[in-house]
Amino acid sequence: MKALNIEDPVVLCRATDHIAEQIAFIADLERKGFTYATGDGIYFDTSRQPDYGFLARLDKAGLQAGSRVDIGDKRQATDFALWKFSAPGEKRQMEWESPWGKGFPGWHIECSAMAEKYLGDWFDIHCGGEDHIPVHHTNEIAQTEARSGTHLANFWMHGYFLIANDAKMAKSSGDFLRVATLVDRGYDPLAFRYLCLTGHYRTQLNFTFEALDAAQTGLDRMRQGFHALSATPKASPDAALIERFTDQVNDDLNLPRALAVAWETLRGTLPAPTKRATLLRFDEVLGLGLADWRPQAVEAPGEVRALAEARAAARKARDFAEADRLRGALAELGWEMEDGAQGYTLKQR
């Protein structure tokens, strides 16, 4: 996470450390009349929730909600397990005592119990993957709202899958992207972050190394452009650009358009210190580490150094035609020469 410039979470909680909270949650649902028992567990009665399934926009009759038992043991196909009984005579690796007998929690109750403990009955934003919409989050909403009588979250934000070469990534197939793999191939991990910024979170992002190459190039150019900007202590961000950037972020987290505003700023005509201050403010959201980046020193080949010396001599002799020719020769080799009061500097393009 550090390599991708992702902040650490404030709380990392384990479901197995919160069994008591899950049992208390189920017991409260039972007291409110939202549960019933079958031969293999305690189930949530979705018929008690008239708007069950609204998040997924699905008909209750067509929604198969993570059932662990045959429909014959449940009142509705959408009903789901809150607590499962351990099989008689069998010892499970993970099982706990409860008011209903020895067993273990269902698939969804842990999230409601831990969210309630650390965030309260009602919070602003709930995130998850697109695959959580039809079952897991639908059931989480049902059980939490049944207990609390309030909405679980004001906003639901579901990230769509990262796919590779037009196929879903899967550990089982070995086609699973790791940061270490990118580093081993010579990529900056923040190039992957840049790539993610180019796609909206509610669209699937197709990962290819060609796309990562383009992202690395874009990141390098933004870093180099930022690094070339002069700074003054009193420079302030441009208020109009900050407003435009913020509007894009507030528009369903439209980071591709926010990134476009950053590029427009870098290429625009504002004074360099204002550009720099504005981009620094943007990077508090984009997280590309612009202020921390430093260009790596690259030793120019002998041929390049010789051309640079020849151009410096031609410029000193005021042979500008020859100086321009030599500058072009340097460019063909992928180098550029910047003149200054103390001489020249060479930069690889």
Feature annotation, model-predicted:
Residues 9-10, 38, 324, 339:
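Short, hydrophobic secondary-structure boundary micro-motifs
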Residues 12-15, 101, 130-131, 300, ...:
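A generic secondary-structure micro-motif detector
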Residues 6-9, 31, 253-256:
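Short, well-ordered coil/turn segments that N-cap beta-strands
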Residues 17, 106-110, 253, 257-260:
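Aromatic- and histidine-enriched alpha-helix N-cap/loop-to-helix transition segments
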Residues 8, 19-230:
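Alpha-helical recognition segments enriched in aromatics with Gly/Pro capping
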Residues 2-15:
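Divalent metal-dependent hydrolysis catalytic cores, especially in the metallo-beta-lactamase
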Residues 167-171, 175-349:
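Structural preference for alpha-helix termini/caps and helix-kink/transition segments
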